[in-house]
UniProtKB/Swiss-Prot annotation:
It comes from Acidithiobacillus ferrooxidans (strain ATCC 23270 / DSM 14882 / CIP 104768 / NCIMB 8455) (Ferrobacillus ferrooxidans (strain ATCC 23270)). Keywords: ATP-binding, DNA-binding, Metal-binding, Nucleotide-binding, Repressor, Transcription, Transcription regulation, Zinc, Zinc-finger. Negatively regulates transcription of bacterial ribonucleotide reductase nrd genes and operons by binding to NrdR-boxes. The lineage of its organism: Bacteria, Pseudomonadati, Pseudomonadota, Acidithiobacillia, Acidithiobacillales. GO terms for molecular function: ATP binding; DNA binding; zinc ion binding. This is Transcriptional repressor NrdR. The keyword S-adenosyl-L-methionine does not apply. Binds 1 zinc ion. NCBIfam families: transcriptional regulator NrdR. It comes from the Bacteria. Residues 49-139 form the ATP-cone domain. GO terms for biological process: negative regulation of DNA-templated transcription. The keyword Transcription applies. It holds the Pfam family ATP-cone.
């Protein structure tokens, strides 16, 4: 790596540590030419597929949009941030595992609903009401009944355990 201070072409790593809970590596580097030290971060670049919207438009997958949607649905609900972050990672992992270059936005919505069902039933119904465009109280009742039928007796998946 080039030195950002003198542009010397070869710096050396003096120290490496895991950062971001193992999601990246923090490296301290030193330039043998000018003696300056600086920090770099290294993380895997994992491309997510392009999202195909219902109207046919295509846009890049946006992790922040996913995080915002979950956070909005969970607003004022007793769910730890670590669990929301775990849900975002789980959704991204499931999308990557499909191995497709494009995915429908509908699939992301369904994955979000699945995660919310495990995180908080109130947030799930809140999100479902917007996502599925509930028109009346009966739609809420039907969704709640469907949710109760699908309840998992052992407490759900890893999202219920926290990180």
């Amino acid at each position: 790596m080039h030195c950002p201070f003198c542009a010397y072409a070869d710096t050396r790593v003096v120290d490496s540590r895991l950062a971001d809970d193992g999601g990246s590596v923090r490296r301290r580097r030193e330039c043998p030419q000018c003696g300056q030290r600086f920090t770099t971060f290294e993380r895997a670049e994992l491309a997510l597929p392009v999202v195909v919207k219902t109207d046919g438009r295509r846009e890049s997958f946006n992790e922040e949009k996913l995080q915002r949607g979950l956070t909005r649905a969970l607003s004022k609900r007793p769910v730890a941030t670590a669990r929301v972050d775990a849900a975002v990672r789980m959704i991204q992992r499931r999308i990557r595992e499909r191995g497709e270059r494009e995915i429908p936005a509908r699939l992301i919505g369904e994955l979000v609903m699945e995660a919310l069902r495990d995180l908080d039933p109130v947030a799930y119904v809140r999100f479902a009401s917007v996502y599925r465009r509930f028109e009346d109280v009966d739609a809420f009742s039907v969704e709640i009944a469907r949710m109760k039928e699908a309840e998992v007796p052992d407490g759900g998946d890893d999202l219920n355990r926290g990180d």
